[in-house]
């Protein structure tokens, strides 16, 4: 006679997984709700680009409605290093300028951005300076502008290339050329033209971005040779 085996099936409902504490109130759904309530606060998408896990790393920022992108070179891919960029921007920009660009940040859940308080609060002064939200896991399409603009970086700094020759001055030069490239999405104007129309040339200069004449723009590896 065959042995009968009884399997007890639990009817206990599975609990919905809670968001990690650092992301509570900062999810992409929270971001969409925040944008509905604050439609006049522009979003700045933030990301990191690198070729090797050992670095170096380029922290990128792109400003809503402009396609204007800047980058900060880092040796370390940590929240301490990445949030320090905001400290430097605060030191360099006026309060009005900082708030116009960095009040609202949208990024992914990389470990280098995983300490939201360090981005939202100036740890030196205790001042609340920004609001940060995070895309859902593995959903880079939720910050499409910064992701798409990285294609320009890859034209100049191809995958697999050693980046140890990079300096912040070279990064600034690269983004000056990228921002001086006309875009169909901008009515064939350049990100530099749109950004300076909205914010002024002085602010672009403070961000170390210069206008490059269209016939002098180079978006190939030759630029940084």
PLM region spans:
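Secondary-structure boundary/capping micro-motif
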Residues: 1-148, 154-162, 167, 173-177, ...
